[in-house]
UniProtKB/Swiss-Prot annotation:
Protein name in UniProt: D-arabinitol 4-dehydrogenase
Gene Ontology biological-process entries: arabitol metabolic process; D-glucuronate catabolic process
Similarity comment: family membership: Belongs to the mannitol dehydrogenase family.
EC identifiers of the protein: 1.1.1.11
Pathway: Carbohydrate metabolism; D-arabinitol metabolism
Top-rank EC class of the record's enzyme: oxidoreductase
A Pfam family the protein falls into: Mannitol_dh
Catalytic function, reaction form: D-arabinitol + NAD(+) = D-xylulose + NADH + H(+)
Lineage of origin: Bacteria, Pseudomonadati, Pseudomonadota, Gammaproteobacteria, Enterobacterales
Keywords annotated in UniProt: NAD, Oxidoreductase
Length: 463
């Protein structure tokens, strides 16, 4: 471990200006600064233009904003976050981002671009036929691969030194999967020299991140003003719980994150499996189910007995046996997660959590389906989750969802065509992008059809 760096301060460049980064990674760096350790600061950037208003607001506030956290009992705390010292302007060519990323003082580049932002198929290879990937292979910067490859190419040319690439999304083996996608991207471009440089001059540790961070509500700025006296046009909110587990494999130094509560480990595997399967998959289950019966918020859906029972049964009957033995108390973790979801003060929306289902099923749910069959069992409880998503997307197809569904890899024409076919459930069950080897399994297809019927019947009696 090498945390001691001489001045000038090292820069942690983060790509992805959403609320989660500002409530999570930026908080840890802020706590280090508040403790007197000023060796690292953050530069914040975005790949797409949708964050321009936020970046402009943060720049006007000198990168400062207030984080509101709330406990399940309703206790709120407010903290002004000061770790964002450079807000990078967006430009279409990402020249400003590349300029910061290629500086020698930039020692870590982290990113949050959502699960779908890595464009990986169910074999975790790059989706070469995706239009954004194709554009980046031709030289654009629409994806994390296009942006990072430009930065690294400039670092190679400028001899700026090694850099750590840190994936902070809910992707299993997130560092390894990103690195595989990046190297495949460079190979497809024929950039062998850069590929060799990346292999020797970068590291990509796996991480596990956790803090429920809803989109800021309309009234948070007023609460911040009343409680702190600060006029903040870019506040964020989150639950009081926070966790960050990181494999300690940094090539160019790192902040002393263990001093502010991060867990530096040799392997994140047991942590990430528990989090992805228990927290993330249950979250999606609850959001899809709640949306189908007209509920808006995660807490009200979690407090609905039938929905809570679906999530509880999924974890208890199928996930815990799949992950046992584990160094974690999985039953306790299940109960803590459901308590966190029940927090009425977070007001996290089903719309936010229901998003990106086409990435979440293969990433969060299918591994448990497969392992249940491998143990000789039948994943009756787990099959309810993709069944919920099927009925959820059927509602989307019919135009009856109460909100706009957001999914980075959604193919609207293909989904509409599926539901217009003579056998939508069969096409869904045989989708190898969602279910991998189970897409050719008649037993699984029969189970999924039964589960879809169960969900449809439940929705019809509870809507």
């Amino acid at each position: 471990m090498n945390t001691d760096l001489k001045s000038p301060p090292a820069v942690w460049l983060h790509i992805g200006a959403g609320s989660f980064h500002r409530a999570h990674q930026a908080w840890y760096l802020h706590r280090l600064l508040a403790s007197g350790d000023d060796r690292w600061t953050i530069a914040l950037a975005n790949i797409r233009d949708d964050a321009i208003p936020l970046l402009d607001t943060l720049r006007a506030q000198h990168g400062e904003y207030v984080l509101e956290t709330v406990t399940p009992s309703g206790e709120r705390q407010y903290e002004k976050i000061t770790s964002l010292r450079n807000i990078i302007p967006w430009d279409k060519a990402l020249d400003h981002l590349v300029a910061q990323g290629s500086k020698p003082e930039t020692r870590v580049i982290s990113f949050t671009v959502t699960e779908g932002g890595y464009y990986l198929d169910n074999q975790f290879n790059l989706q070469q036929d995706n239009s954004d990937i194709q554009a980046d292979l031709r030289g654009d910067c629409r994806t994390i691969y296009g942006a990072i490859s430009r930065i690294l190419q400039q670092r190679q040319q400028d001899k700026s030194g090694p850099v750590t690439l840190l994936n902070c999304d809910n992707l299993r083996h997130n560092g390894e999967r990103f690195r595989h996608g990046l190297l495949e991207f460079l190979a497809l471009r024929g950039q062998q020299s850069l590929l060799n440089w990346v292999t020797s001059q970068t590291r990509s540790p796996n991480t596990m991140v956790d803090r429920i961070t809803p989109r800021p509500s309309a009234d948070i700025a007023q609460r911040v003003l009343e409680k702190t006296g600060i006029v903040d046009n870019a506040p964020v909110m989150g639950e009081s719980f926070i966790q960050w587990v990181i494999e300690d494999d940094f090539i160019a130094g790192r902040p002393a994150l263990e001093n502010v509560g991060a867990e530096m480990v040799t392997s994140v595997l047991p942590y990430e499996e528990a989090k992805i399967r228990i927290l993330n998959a249950s979250h999606s289950c609850i959001a899809w189910a709640g949306s189908l019966i007209g509920q808006c918020y995660i807490h009200e859906s979690t407090q609905t007995d039938a929905i809570r029972q679906m999530a509880y049964d999924y974890v208890t009957q199928d996930v815990i046996p799949s992950l046992t033995p584990s160094p974690l108390d999985l039953a306790h973790y299940r109960d803590v997660v459901l308590e966190r979801f029940s927090n009425p003060y977070i007001r996290d929306t089903n719309q936010r959590v229901a998003a990106d289902g086409f990435s979440k099923i293969p990433g969060f749910i299918t591994p448990t389906l497969i392992e249940c069959y491998q143990r000789g069992g039948v994943p009756t409880a787990t099959a309810m989750l993709p069944a919920l998503f099927f009925v959820f997307m059927e509602s989307w197809h019919q135009g009856t969802l109460p909100y706009e569904y957001q999914d980075g890899i959604l193919d609207p024409a293909a989904v509409h065509a599926m539901f217009q076919s003579s056998d939508p459930a069969g096409l869904f069950a045989r989708d190898s992008a969602l279910f991998g080897p189970l897409a050719n399994d008649d037993q699984f297809e029969q189970l999924l059809r039964q589960s879809i019927n169960r969900v449809s019947a439940w929705v019809s009696t509870n809507r």
